[in-house]
Amino acid sequence: MESIHIQTTSKKYDVYVGKHVLSSLTEVVQRMKPAVSNVMIISDESVATLHLQKVKEALQIKQDVFSFVIPSGEKEKSFENFYAVHTAALENKLDRNSLIIALGGGMIGDLAGFVAATFMRGIRFVQVPTTLLAHDSAVGGKVAINHPLGKNMIGAFHQPEAVLYHTPFLDSLPEKEWRSGFAEVIKHALIGDVELYHWLKNNVTTLADLRDDKLVYVLKRAIPVKAKIVAQDETEKGVRAHLNFGHTLGHALEKESGYGNITHGDGVAIGMLFAIFLSEQMYKIDLRYKELKQWFLQYGYPSIPRHLKVDRLVNVMKQDKKANAGTIRMVLMQEYGGVHVVSISDKTVHTSLEAFQKDMVLGEEMNFE
């Protein structure tokens, strides 16, 4: 079975991508040493309705298999759900040789992964992503839950035993989720695979093109970009911060819009455009910002919401995990495939963000006409 190999300081594992990888789930579980004592599948209501039974049927093992389904929505990564899953794990007598399977998108992967990282000080888990966005979050071992004051503020680094990307699970995604996930694909192309970036521009005219063999190809190109960075910096002490390209403003937009009102990918798309806009200004270079803006609008990515206040966005950006002593630090670009983290003054960010917001509104109006 063809796979993408992930090598980190703490673990080696494989990512399997394709139309039939679910049939390999039993083999993946049975290969684990020590032997798995029992299994708990964690999912949400939306995904469970569509796919939970398929996963149970694919898992042909003699050990007990339990499932725990949480309500769907933006509060999936809450402390309440985290506590509830731990309670279910204890009630079902999971132990240190148990296995958790995360069946769902990025939020389920994060929640289930953090449960695995903390239950009895750490047990094994497998990621079974069901969204395009999760091609990013399912790889690399960052797991977390949210706090009312910030996203992903309570978490750990806990690598999965394997990732099984059964692409037919993505068929049920609404268009906004395809768009959200595609933003992370674009991010990986821009920061680490320029050839993929050009391929996307030539071969993915609309989001409907991301199906079948093209989808598998895109995943097999995008995931290794992250894998290479994670291999160099598993716990985000250095170059792993490059994966936050577009996320400084993106996270601020999510928070100020109210979590759930703008998708993660839409926020990241706007954030990437701003990072390129700012990079052109700071380094006096041409990164083809206007061309990229039109390309993003072609896929339906939104402009920066007009009602959001620049002052408030800047303040939220100062709370970003990359910030240092209240100084904003962003991932900027000097060339495609070449990014780095830079400290930027509040004044520079404020001035550039005001100009960017005006330019995005103008671009939206011109595109509408």
UniProtKB/Swiss-Prot annotation:
Primary subcellular site in the record, as a coarse category: cytoplasm
Cofactor binding summary note: Binds 1 divalent metal cation per subunit. Can use either Co(2+) or Zn(2+).
Superkingdom of origin: Bacteria
Keywords for this protein: Amino-acid biosynthesis, Aromatic amino acid biosynthesis, Cobalt, Cytoplasm, Lyase, Metal-binding, NAD, Nucleotide-binding, Zinc
A GO molecular-function descriptor: nucleotide binding
Subcellular location per the Swiss-Prot or TrEMBL entry: Cytoplasm
Assigned GO CC terms: cytoplasm
SUPFAM superfamilies cross-referenced by the UniProt entry: Dehydroquinate synthase-like (SSF56796)
Residues the entry annotates as binding Zn(2+): E184, H247, H264
Binding site for NAD(+): S72, G73, E74, K75, E76, K77, T130, T131, K142, K151
Cofactor(s), by name: Co(2+); Zn(2+); NAD(+)
Pathway: Metabolic intermediate biosynthesis; chorismate biosynthesis; chorismate from D-erythrose 4-phosphate and phosphoenolpyruvate: step 2/7
Matches recorded under Pfam families: DHQ_synthase, DHQS_C
UniProt xrefs under InterPro entries: Dehydroquinate_synthase, DHQ_synth_AroB, DHQ_synth_fam, DHQS/DOIS_N, DHQS_C
UniProt KW Cytoplasm keyword: yes
GO biological processes: amino acid biosynthetic process; aromatic amino acid family biosynthetic process; chorismate biosynthetic process
EC number(s) from the headed UniProt entry: 4.2.3.4
Keyword Protein biosynthesis: no
Catalyzed reactions: 7-phospho-2-dehydro-3-deoxy-D-arabino-heptonate = 3-dehydroquinate + phosphate
Purpose: Catalyzes the conversion of 3-deoxy-D-arabino-heptulosonate 7-phosphate (DAHP) to dehydroquinate (DHQ).
Stated family: Belongs to the sugar phosphate cyclases superfamily. Dehydroquinate synthase family.
Protein name: 3-dehydroquinate synthase
Organism placement in taxonomy: Bacteria, Bacillati, Bacillota, Bacilli, Bacillales
